[in-house]
């Protein structure tokens, strides 16, 4: 890939947009303030968890007593689900069950992975940032997600890419705007037949039959200049 992808995310609390490196520390300032303001109130433990796949990321806040299945379902809905494939969490030194609690799995300095589809596998990595005592009711809150990446057309290099060729993608940067996609059809019969897939904000992009998530659709689209 000859493009430099810029990854940034919007803060759930103040909607400020910050870089991938900055957003985590920024969210922490809000969470610390919320925890301090909740002293003396009814609270419960939450884990701030970072999910990453290269330039794509999610910051989520999860009830520490919830089961791992809640994260599996969330990842399927926002990033992964296409054909009902199997999935699992894992770590090189221990096994992780969907019935384990968040607090049992996410301890400091431990990074785990989540695999979706054992054929054409999409793997993401997860780690805990910090835990907080917060006055919330929701079992899971999306704190931030990377904005659509600045994927530009490989042919004209002027317009945002709206589709990709899943066949040519393994050999070249095969992302195209609407007009240049018509030109690619002339040289790639597979593209016209089945390999034309949409650009989406997910590490599952271009794999199997994935066409986008079922939640947070506003940030699942094409980059806008």
Where are these regions (language model features)?
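Short linear regulatory motifs enriched in tryptophan with gly/pro/ser
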Residues: 1-225
């Amino acid at each position: 890939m000859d493009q430099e992808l810029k990854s940034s995310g919007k803060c759930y609390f103040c909607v400020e947009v910050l870089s991938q490196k900055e957003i985590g520390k920024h969210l922490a300032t809000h969470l610390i303030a919320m925890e301090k303001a909740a002293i003396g109130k009814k609270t419960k433990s939450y884990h701030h968890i970072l999910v990453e796949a290269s330039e794509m990321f999610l910051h989520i806040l999860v009830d520490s007593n919830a089961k791992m299945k809640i994260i599996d379902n969330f990842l399927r809905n926002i990033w992964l689900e296409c054909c009902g494939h199997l999935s699992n969490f894992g770590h090189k030194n221990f096994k992780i069950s969907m019935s384990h609690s968040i607090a049992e799995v996410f301890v400091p300095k431990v990074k785990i992975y989540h695999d979706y589809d054992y054929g054409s596998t999409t793997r993401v990595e997860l780690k805990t940032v910090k835990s907080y005592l917060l006055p919330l009711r929701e079992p899971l809150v999306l704190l931030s997600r990377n904005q659509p990446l600045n994927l530009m057309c490989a042919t004209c290099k002027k317009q945002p890419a709206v589709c990709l060729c899943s066949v040519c993608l393994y050999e070249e940067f095969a992302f195209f705007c609407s007009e240049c996609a018509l030109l690619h059809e002339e040289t790639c019969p597979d593209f016209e037949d089945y390999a034309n897939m949409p650009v989406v904000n997910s590490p599952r992009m271009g794999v199997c039959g994935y066409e986008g998530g079922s939640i947070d659709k506003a940030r699942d689209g094409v980059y806008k200049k």
